[in-house]
UniProtKB/Swiss-Prot annotation, chains A, B:
PROSITE patterns: DAP_EPIMERASE (PS01326). This is Diaminopimelate epimerase. It comes from the Archaea. Homodimer. Its EC number is 5.1.1.7. It comes from Methanopyrus kandleri (strain AV19 / DSM 6324 / JCM 9639 / NBRC 100938). Keywords: Amino-acid biosynthesis, Cytoplasm, Isomerase, Lysine biosynthesis. The active site is at residues 73, 196. The gene is dapF. It is found in: Cytoplasm. The keyword Amino-acid biosynthesis applies.
Length: 279, 279
């Protein structure tokens, strides 16, 4: 079984091309995602994307590390467009996902992806409630959220827990500096990540509202540089990298470590993990 | 450039076969290790092993994530023997490393590797100072070090710091249960790891000294089951897995993220990280 390892702003994915044929049966997709994302005994990634290319559009489905299916991811979208363009040599304009159709465009080494409209819903004491397709609490800070985010963790957890009754929130810190915005997000269910696409868009909107208006905002994240075009879309613009092509050896379902960990995560009657015999 | 992703008890490695020719120039090997081990923009691994097979022996060199070269690693050794046996179809009896020659043997699905002799140097109040090729402080515990190790971290750090003036020590916790020993190690410079080969050997020696003597000890780690034959070698016996074959796309040196992170880790005169322009 063939796959590709790709990343956008250090948000990394296993990409499986199912254009010619289904490679992982539908019912196996969640378990494959759990296995493939395991960084030590699988391939190692934040998620798995399955694609079907049908120029001028391409379909992308994305599964998280826990096997759940997500609607959309800006970083994954760029990787898919880069793959279809450079590996399949095809030209695509539309990316189809569970969250609908998104305009995409290759701009030299950069890839632009139309992302859900972002809107400031409420201004509160500590920051801004923003809907960017997913809920964000944008907090302006003078600290450097890229290198100095450790000290922000407790506050981020406090803000997160206040919104937990309403399904929780992604807490995005933004530090305006001379010619760019430095952003890092404490993501719901994940924690700090190198670069959260919707967080970058939410922070750019608030930045433009207070200091702008700006047509385009240049954002630095721990995963690299992104740009947000607010006047057109909005568009999330960034790079993507195709790191390598892989060929699995043997059937991933037979992978002993995956079986052992699935087996050991099942609970014995006493509630303790049931561990296989050390044979 | 071709590589293989392998793991032994969830201690994972990028394997580069240089039998036919040098694949990564000597001077690039440390930098390649730093790039390849990066779990998001590289391949992702604990280390990189370079091998040259010359039956009945095989040479293994191993580089850590930080680019430093290590002398030996039991988990990596099993992966190398599995690769030479199953992928190259060759029969090897001796593994050559910086720490010398090690007897190796394939036993069905298990692989036995001769590891450095282990010796209890001193018995102190909290545990046992053991030389297993590398220094270990073995501490017996009633807690389950596989699932319940969080609570042991502070103590492990305290013990580690007491030995820091003497170069530090790996702190290995061992919990004897009915028919097996449960072991986890707080490794020098790394922290908790799924399975440390020398830690498993050190703990087995102490276990045999107190409750034995035993010819062979069965050990459960967070990375799976290992066995230690004390009467013969000693031998560290365990499984290994070849997960996939990979083909890098383009030159890893040109990998923009690796360049960006190397560039951004260089310091400007003020001491702050020097960050590339967000172009």
């Amino acid at each position: 079984m063939q796959f590709w390892k790709v990343h956008g702003a250090r948000n990394d994915f296993v990409l499986v091309d199912e254009t010619e044929e289904e490679v992982v049966p539908e019912s196996d997709k969640p378990d494959f995602a759990r296995w493939a994302c395991d960084r030590r005994s699988g391939v190692g990634a934040d998620g798995v994307v399955f694609i079907r290319s049908d120029p001028p559009s391409v379909e992308m489905r994305i599964f998280n590390r826990d096997g759940s299916e997500a609607e959309f991811c800006g970083n994954a979208a760029r990787c898919v467009v880069k793959y279809v363009t450079e590996v399949r040599g095809e030209n695509v304009k539309i990316l189809r996902t569970l969250s609908g159709a998104h305009r995409v465009e290759v701009q030299g080494g950069w890839i632009a992806v139309e992302v859900p409209e972002a809107e400031i819903k409420k201004v509160v004491e500590l920051g801004y409630e923003v809907d960017a397709g997913v809920p964000h609490f944008v907090r302006l800070t003078e600290r450097d959220p890229i290198h100095d985010f450790g000290g922000l963790t407790d506050e981020a957890k406090t803000i997160f827990s206040e919104y937990e009754p309403k399904g929780g929130v992604n807490v995005t810190y933004a530090a305006p500096s001379v010619d760019e915005l430095r952003v890092r997000t404490f993501e719901r269910g994940v924690g700090w990540t190198p670069a959260c696409g919707s967080g970058v868009v939410a922070a750019s909107l608030v930045y433009s509202e207070i200091f702008g208006p700006f047509e385009e905002v240049s954002v630095r994240t721990a995963g690299g540089c992104l740009r947000v075009s607010l006047s057109d879309g909005p568009l999330l613009i960034g790079r993507a990298e195709i790191v390598y092509k892989g060929e699995l050896r043997g059937d991933w379902r037979e992978n002993t470590d995956h079986q052992r960990r699935r087996h050991s995560l099942s609970r014995s009657p006493s509630g303790r993990p049931r561990l296989q015999e050390c044979r």
